[in-house]
């Protein structure tokens, strides 16, 4: 009779819920064996569910594949709302039918998984472009226009250039066919890939700024208006990376000028 350890090693090779190996092992009434069977079935079911989820996020891409297009770029940005730091956009071209396990809207990915999935995108993408527009430009042209500039910069770095753009809730003035998708980072794998690249890139930048400008907790809040960030603003004032067109930074700058 096989040991439970041997059965556990055998079960790792089973990839289908209908496998005859399950049927045979279910005759073994040892509780340890039944526990390992249940555990393996849960893993297989989770993998099937994940594959279905990823498949559903390729619906926009598949429509474009039918038209003979393969160089499809997903575009997304991070950093519209913070009081400090740049807005960062990424453009990513994935191989046809590419499925990266765990890839999703970056806001839905556990923080501890960010770097792992970012690396998987880096490893598998055909091309990646990153656009970074700093706070000074944001203050000059407004955050909406700055976001478009960041996206255009990211797209310009792609090689080969894309045949079609899938963009998260935005239209760009570019001579490339494009589809604007509401909640695109949750509905398109290409946009989700861009989302995690932009997120990790910006988070790393804000960690560097945290070393330059201590007291604002940039490494944790990424420039968003948390209690610690606002406390830092009150105590230490405005840094060179703060967006002076955003409140309450704007009022602090005006108050300083008037005093």
UniProtKB/Swiss-Prot annotation:
Keywords: Cytoplasm, Endonuclease, Hydrolase, Manganese, Metal-binding, Nuclease. Its cofactor is Mn(2+); Mg(2+). A divalent metal cation binds at residues 76-77, 168. One of its GO terms (biological process) is DNA replication, removal of RNA primer. Residues 70-258 form the RNase H type-2 domain. It holds the Pfam family RNase_HII. The keyword Nucleotidyltransferase does not apply. One of its GO terms (molecular function) is manganese ion binding. It is found in: Cytoplasm. Its EC number is 3.1.26.4. This is Ribonuclease HII. It comes from Streptococcus pneumoniae (strain 70585).
């Amino acid at each position: 009779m096989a040991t439970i350890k041997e059965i556990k090693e055998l079960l790792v090779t089973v990839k289908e819920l209908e496998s005859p190996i399950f049927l045979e092992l279910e005759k073994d009434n040892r509780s340890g064996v039944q526990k390992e069977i249940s555990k393996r079935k849960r893993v297989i079911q989770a993998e099937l569910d994940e594959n279905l989820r990823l498949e559903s996020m390729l619906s926009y891409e598949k429509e474009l594949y039918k038209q003979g297009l393969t160089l499809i770029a997903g575009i997304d940005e991070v950093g519209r709302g913070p009081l400090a730091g740049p807005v960062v956009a990424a453009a990513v071209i994935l191989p046809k039918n590419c499925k990266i396990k765990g890839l999703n809207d970056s806001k839905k990915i556990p923080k501890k998984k960010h770097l792992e999935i970012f690396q998987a995108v880096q490893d598998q993408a055909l091309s990646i472009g990153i656009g970074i527009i700093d706070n000074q430009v944001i203050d000059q042209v407004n955050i909406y226009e700055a976001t478009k500039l960041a996206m255009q910069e990211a797209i310009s770095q792609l090689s080969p250039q894309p045949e079609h753009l899938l963009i998260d809730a935005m239209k760009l003035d570019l001579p490339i066919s494009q589809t604007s998708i509401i909640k695109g980072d949750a509905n398109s794998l290409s946009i989700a890939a861009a989302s995690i690249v932009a997120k990790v890139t910006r988070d790393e930048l804000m960690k560097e700024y945290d070393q330059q400008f201590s007291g604002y907790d940039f490494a944790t809040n990424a420039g968003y208006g948390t209690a610690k960030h606002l406390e830092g603003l009150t105590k230490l004032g405005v840094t060179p990376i703060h967006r002076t067109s955003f409140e309450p930074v704007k009022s602090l700058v005006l108050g300083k000028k008037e005093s």
